[in-house]
A protein has these predicted regions:
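The feature marks proteins involved in alpha-glucan
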Residues: 1
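Aromatic- and acidic-residue-enriched carbohydrate-binding clefts of CAZyme catalytic domains
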Residues: 32-100, 111-130
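Short, solvent-exposed turn/loop segments enriched in Gly/Ser/Thr/Pro and often Arg
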Residues: 21-30, 109-114, 139-144, 163-166
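Active-site-proximal helices and loops of the catalytic beta/alpha 8
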Residues: 42, 69, 101, 123-125, ...
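Catalytic domains of carbohydrate-active enzymes, especially glycoside hydrolases
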Residues: 5-26, 62, 130
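Short amphipathic alpha-helical segments and helix-helix/interface helices
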Residues: 9, 92-95, 145-150
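Secondary-structure transition into beta-strands, especially the periplasmic turns and strand N-termini
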Residues: 16, 100-103
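Active-site cores of enzymes that catalyze phosphoryl transfer or operate on phosphate-rich substrates
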Residues: 106
Length: 167
């Protein structure tokens, strides 16, 4: 939880750590729900009784996504990472305590291809304004990194990105 990290800050500081990077800590869907697909006609076959799978023998496959590299609600801290009902206050307290101890908070964000670039910039600005995060590690293709680096607010943060377009 965010509070558990806050409690470990003295230990992290003693180790000489100056920056923590949080994997996606914004709200995202944890339950992986498989998409139903319809087989094309050329893949359909005439089944026989012995070929059928009995419904009681099929076990549901539950997959939990703890990583966060999926589309998300980029404007809210992850509620399940909070030990209280107020994830926003708990995250704010984490960043504040890091700063009091001379440490920085960098957040990792994954944005899906084709996402509105203005929403991306707005989300990053939001986390700087609301929570005072110190930087971002951006994941995804064709992100507005140049615009972020030139933005009045975001230009004062650290930006990590590995998919720069060649000139």
């Amino acid at each position: 939880t965010f509070r558990a990290i806050t409690d470990k800050i003295p230990y992290l500081k003693k180790l000489g750590i100056t920056t923590i990077e949080l994997m996606p800590a914004y709200e995202f869907e944890e339950q992986v729900i498989p998409k139903k697909t319809v087989l094309p006609d050329y893949l359909k076959w005439e089944s026989h009784g012995e070929d059928l799978i009995k419904p009681e023998s099929v076990q549901p496959v539950e997959k939990i996504n703890y990583w966060g590299y999926v589309p998300g609600n980029y404007f809210a801290p992850k509620a399940s990472y909070s030990s209280s009902a107020d994830a926003a206050s708990e995250f704010r307290e984490l960043v504040h305590t890091l700063h009091e101890n001379g440490m920085e908070c960098v957040m990792e964000f994954y944005f899906v291809p084709g996402m509105n670039q203005n929403v991306i910039l707005d989300a990053l600005r939001f986390w700087v304004r609301e929570y005072h995060v110190d930087g971002f590690h951006l994941q995804g293709d064709s992100l507005p990194v140049t615009a972020a680096a030139q933005d009045l607010l975001l230009s004062r943060t650290k930006l990590f990105y590995t998919h720069f377009d060649p000139i």
